[in-house]
Amino acid sequence: MVAISFLEAEIERHGNQEAYLLRELRSGGEAGFDEKKLLQGFFGYFERLKPRLVSFNGRGFDLPVLKYRAMVHGVSVSWLYGAGDNWNSSQSRYSTDWHCDLLDVLSDYVASARVSLHEVSAVLDLPGKFGISGSQVAELVDEGRIEDVRHYCETDLLTT
């Protein structure tokens, strides 16, 4: 793992509607940080702020990978399991207050076909991918192009 990117937004509520004001978009740490340091920074940030996590397939891929890698390095994520209650927590699939996985929401929690972030972007006339796909990340890392990977992650995040 060479990059963990995040977007911080302020939620403005207007009745039943929410609007999001972008505050910050970046990759955590620095390009030279090792995996353990990246994970400590990411999970420490979330433990302090307890923000709503918004992802695209984050519940099925990103968050499990982050948790497994945290286990390898002895980075505690216990707070993830204690926040909220049984029905409204970061582990509750159907509550979007702590974690809104857009893939789950758009597919009616896999009751209908799953679509890619690229397909959703095309339908909404959003730019989507900018010249790099996920299949190229390992090659970029091997070539030492960590900044390119960080920018790719940030672009994916902005699209989400």
List each model region and its residues:
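Metal-dependent phosphoesterase core characteristic of DEDDh/y 3'-5' exonuclease domains
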Residues: V2-E12, Q17-G28, R48-H151, T155-T159
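Short, flexible loop segments at the rims of nucleotide/cofactor-binding pockets, characterized by
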Residues: G28-D34
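Short, basic/hydrophobic alpha-helical segments
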Residues: E35-L49
